[in-house]
């Protein structure tokens, strides 16, 4: 290989690595981002492996999923969450995502060249919007990324089965098994059948054997698998094996055609590059706040990577033909994966009435869109359609601009708190966990704790209460309340109430006694505890009889500092500012 081409490949690889690392760094505190993640963390802390396995098995049987491997995977996840390690939380969140990005890059790289594979990773990271609509980027990805890895591996083995004369049948059977196992994780993986159809048609057409009969023979194992999965699900709906819970029948109630189109568009396109620019609040926030220097630098690196790809990728008709098929698979997967959910009335209501701009399938669709975009971009130089000198510069500028706008979008989504599973939810959960581990509440003997800034799990404080009781050095009983009206009516009947407040600007918790209630405000005559989940230097101020009292403190991650106080202080006046 000429030295120039080799060095350009290195530059592309370095650019890809830098952008991916920057994205992962920006998400370093993004875990425990939704109600389900928090509840399963709590379950993992108080229950054993067997409980997790049985709970997941029941969950699966309610939905007609018959398998033991998936419950085992979930039980392992419970145990890792139950370790209480922040690194375990983060690793469970992002290693599965990285595995699938690498797997897709490897597949494309093997078929169309290493640079095409690197480009996929670069585009995935550069254009990733971390929205708050149950995105798998921030919520419980292991189950679904495990399912996606099974589905992708099954597709690869299916192609291998068409190329292998010796082991073709065995590879096809294993592929069908992986197809089945992927559906154990999520019903929506049934739609991967559409991708199998595209691949089968492509192979038969290339071999000059395309006919309905040959198509059926090619897909027989997968057709049987899909029909069997549907039959088991229908059987269980009419003859439950275990008691059905709320939500099990949601996928059986059909909606209407108009709302189906709207829902499919939202669920499929919710993470399409720059899609969140449709939100007026996002656009306004970008215009108001602009872009940070690090975002400009990372976007510039992404643009350089794209420039190097377009400049050095040479014409290759065989590779061009392959990326056409892979790109078609990507767009079919992106459009079809949310199909089942989009047909149902409950999810149509979420979108049409609740204005939800995405759901769990949306992240899988994003993988499909990135495959399609990568293949579309790669096809231009591979097919010899970019002969001009301007093409690399134009492509680099386009990705730089799109990447920079994506950074602005992610900043706006955090600040504006769009969606129920935003990174802000992560920060609050991690902070509450830090407050529980700090043990200040148990040491002070609070029998009632008022936490108005923490929304709990599905509007219930039960799991946060369990967290507060069990994560302290000495477990104890406490009643946790988030409703102001409930607290003000209940507090007088308790001997030692306390409060946990959240300072949004500094991402810190304020814990103190609730000694008095004055005109709807809690007043403390006691010491004030400041806790940070991520550490830093802070200025703490509050009003004492018209005088502003200030303190400068420095905290390590998960650490707290107590500020001595005996004067009556309105807890609403306590302000913490990050320095």
What are these regions (language model features)?
Residues 3-117, 211, 219, 236-324, ...:
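Intrinsically disordered, polar/acidic, low-complexity terminal segments
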Residues 28, 77-81, 127-137, 205, ...:
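Juxtamembrane "helix-exit" motif on the non-cytosolic side of transmembrane helices
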Residues 67, 116-160, 184-189, 334-376:
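Membrane-interface micro-motifs in multi-pass membrane enzymes
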Residues 191-227, 231, 235:
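Perimembrane helix-loop-helix junctions
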